[in-house]
Amino acid sequence: MIASIRGIIQSIGIDHLIVETGGVGLLIYAPRSTLNAVGQIGSETFLYTLLIVREDALTLYGFSDPAQRNLFEQLIGVSGVGPKIALNLLSSGSPDEIQKSIAGGDIARLARVPGIGKKTAERIVLELRGKIDLRQLSGTTPGNVSTLDRELTDILISLGYSATEAAAAIAALPGDAPPTLEERLRLALRYFGSA
C-alpha cells in the first residue's frame, strides 16, 4: 500500500493532480477540497493516499488528511458506491459534515451529490450510520456536549441503544430543539422510529 506521497505538483486537473516524486509522475485522483488546498504547480505537496488495485488498473487517490482517506475507505465499502461517487461526496463538504449527515440520516443532502440517488443515499446511511462515532468529530467533543445531552445519552444507552446510536440521535436533533430533557428525549426516540 502507498500510504502517502510527497512530491512536486506537475499539473492540477478537475478531479486529479500529477505529483512527481523520485522522477516518476503519479496521477492522483482527489476531492475538490484537496485539489484546492495542495498549492500551486511547481510547489511541494504532501498527500495521504490510497492505492486501489483492480484487474485492469492501479489507481491512486489522494487526500489532505487521514479523516478524508478513512471516510473514503468507508464509502467505497458501501455496495454501489465506487471511488468516483465517494470522491463526489467528499467534494461536497468536510468529512465532519458528511459524517454528521450520514449519522443524522440526511438522505436529501446526500442525494444532492452527483451520482448519488435516493436509494444509494439510503444505503450509505444504512451501512455507515452505526460506524460513525460523532464524539470523534470536531465540534462534538465531550467539552462541547451540554449536560442535557450527556443526560440524554445516558438515558438512551439505558434504553438499549449504543453510544454511537445515541450520539447520532442527538446530532439529528434540530438546532431549535426544546431545552427540556423530556422533549429532547421524545425527539430522539422519534429519530429511532424513523430510522
From Swiss-Prot:
- Domain I: annotated span: 1-64
Flexible linker as annotated region, ranges: 143-151
Location of region: Domain II: 65-142
- Which SMART domains does UniProt cross-reference here? HhH1
Give the chief site where it resides: cytoplasm
**Where does this protein reside within or beyond the cell?**
Cytoplasm
- Record keywords: Membrane included? no
Q: Where is this region: Domain III?
A: 151-195
Instruction: Give the UniProt keywords, A-Z.
Output: Cytoplasm, DNA damage, DNA recombination, DNA repair, DNA-binding
Disulfide bridge map: none
> What are its GO cellular component terms?
cytoplasm; Holliday junction helicase complex; Holliday junction resolvase complex
Q: Which InterPro entries does this entry report, sorted A to Z?
A: DNA_helicase_Holl-junc_RuvA_I, Hlx-hairpin-Hlx_DNA-bd_motif, NA-bd_OB-fold, RuvA, RuvA_2-like, RuvA_C, RuvA_C_sf
Citing just one GO molecular function, the answer is: four-way junction DNA binding
Coiled-coil regions listed: none
Q: Name one Pfam family in it.
A: RuvA_N
Instruction: Please list the GO biological process terms of this entry.
Output: DNA recombination; DNA repair; SOS response
Keyword Cytoplasm tagged: yes
Query: Which NCBIfam families does this UniProt record tie to the protein?
Result: ruvA
Record's comment describing the protein's domains: Has three domains with a flexible linker between the domains II and III and assumes an 'L' shape. Domain III is highly mobile and contacts RuvB.
> What role does it play?
The RuvA-RuvB-RuvC complex processes Holliday junction (HJ) DNA during genetic recombination and DNA repair, while the RuvA-RuvB complex plays an important role in the rescue of blocked DNA replication forks via replication fork reversal (RFR). RuvA specifically binds to HJ cruciform DNA, conferring on it an open structure. The RuvB hexamer acts as an ATP-dependent pump, pulling dsDNA into and through the RuvAB complex. HJ branch migration allows RuvC to scan DNA until it finds its consensus sequence, where it cleaves and resolves the cruciform DNA.
Q: How does it assemble?
A: Homotetramer. Forms an RuvA(8)-RuvB(12)-Holliday junction (HJ) complex. HJ DNA is sandwiched between 2 RuvA tetramers; dsDNA enters through RuvA and exits via RuvB. An RuvB hexamer assembles on each DNA strand where it exits the tetramer. Each RuvB hexamer is contacted by two RuvA subunits (via domain III) on 2 adjacent RuvB subunits; this complex drives branch migration. In the full resolvosome a probable DNA-RuvA(4)-RuvB(12)-RuvC(2) complex forms which resolves the HJ.
Q: Which family is it part of?
A: Belongs to the RuvA family.
- Protein name per UniProt: Holliday junction branch migration complex subunit RuvA
Q: Which gene encodes it?
A: ruvA
